[in-house]
């Protein structure tokens, strides 16, 4: 929700501070929008006493009214775990019509995964060790293959070995299957037995083929994972790389990051020199807040403020001419304080 600032004059007295607090509270109640009381200087002893007496918080200090990132329309997108599969990340992007996902851990940004990164993952088809290199969790493999875990620990990780397809006889399989490999195969008992005897770490049984009690028992004794999938061998081989965790392909270095208190003028300058569409925004504690896009930045509007207890530029916060003054509420004389659009004025003697 867009926030409007309600602020009194410099060197504020009790009248100025309390007017800002009261009017912001009134506007919040009658409009349903967000108005925040601010101050343009330090509070004096009298004001501090009054606020403490009535248990009212002191408004935060506002140095100027230049537009900041926190004034922009930041798009909040829930972060994903680095363990999420490429397939699930793609589905999330498609459902939410977004091109970038934040990868977070405890609300801290770890990296970004983009559609371009996912496209790159599809091109890594010649590296049959990539599942192990990426430390892929068996749970991801089960889900990606629409499979069922028959034996083994789904929370374990495929850490060593390569991915192979056992499309030949057991005699030939012995020549290319090595210890800790992940083997994709069909319903042939002899092939399944050979893969176990070669000490594979995982068997992917395709087309929902039955798995004998003997094979299952041998796998359990050797702590070998067996996954049953309804897909054929070709489809399983195509899908399996989509189980790789996003942290393997995400961008984590040289990210262009902005903070809530950054000024928009600076942000525009930086954005003009980069090719990215979406930029992650962090708060002052490093918590991920959302994305600011080029398009949203181009449609930015000035900070909207309401002046109370004054209406002269020399009394106002610095650079007041850079803001849109939407209202002036004062009991003094009216002075010429230009803004666009013209403010609504209330003056009472």
Predicted regions and their residues:
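Active-site cofactor/cluster-binding pocket
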Residues: 56-58, 63, 302-337
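Short hydrophobic alpha-helical runs that function as membrane-insertion/retention elements
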Residues: 36, 59-61, 101-102, 182-185, ...
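Histidine-anchored nucleotide/phosphate-binding helix
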Residues: 19-27
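Conserved small/polar residues in nucleotide/adenosyl-binding loops
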Residues: 1-5, 338-348
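Short, ordered loop/turn segments at secondary-structure junctions
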Residues: 10-11, 40-42, 106, 115-118, ...
């Amino acid at each position: 929700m867009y926030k409007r600032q309600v602020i009194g004059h410099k060197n504020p007295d009790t009248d100025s501070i309390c007017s800002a607090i009261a009017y912001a509270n009134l506007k919040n109640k009658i409009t349903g929008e967000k108005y925040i009381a601010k101050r343009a200087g330090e509070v004096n002893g009298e004001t501090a006493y009054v606020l403490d007496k009535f248990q009212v918080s002191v408004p935060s200090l506002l140095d100027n009214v230049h537009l900041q990132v926190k004034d922009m329309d930041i798009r909040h997108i829930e972060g994903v775990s680095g363990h999420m599969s490429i397939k699930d990340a793609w589905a999330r992007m498609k459902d939410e019509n977004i091109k970038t996902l934040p990868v977070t851990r405890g609300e801290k940004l770890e990296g970004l995964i983009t559609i371009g990164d996912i496209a790159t993952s599809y091109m890594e088809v010649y590296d049959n060790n990539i599942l192990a290199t990426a430390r892929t969790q068996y749970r991801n493999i089960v889900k990606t293959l629409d499979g069922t875990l028959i034996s083994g620990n789904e929370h374990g990780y495929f850490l060593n070995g390569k991915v192979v397809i056992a499309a030949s006889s057991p005699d030939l399989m012995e020549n290319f299957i090595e210890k800790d490999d992940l083997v994709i195969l069909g319903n042939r008992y002899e092939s399944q037995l050979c893969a176990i005897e070669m000490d594979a770490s995982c068997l992917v049984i395709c087309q929902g083929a039955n798995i004998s009690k003997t094979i299952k028992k041998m796998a359990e004794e050797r702590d070998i994972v067996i996954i049953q999938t309804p897909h054929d061998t070709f489809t399983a081989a195509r899908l399996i790389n989509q189980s790789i965790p996003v942290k393997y392909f995400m961008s984590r270095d040289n990210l262009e990051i902005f903070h809530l208190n950054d000024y928009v003028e600076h942000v525009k300058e930086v954005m003009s020199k980069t090719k990215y569409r979406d930029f992650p925004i962090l708060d002052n504690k490093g918590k991920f807040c959302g994305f600011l896009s080029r398009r949203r930045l181009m449609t930015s509007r000035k900070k909207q403020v309401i002046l109370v207890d004054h209406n002269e530029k020399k009394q106002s916060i610095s650079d007041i001419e850079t803001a849109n003054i939407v209202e002036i509420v004062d009991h003094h004389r009216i002075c010429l304080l230009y803004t666009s659009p013209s403010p609504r004025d209330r003056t009472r003697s």
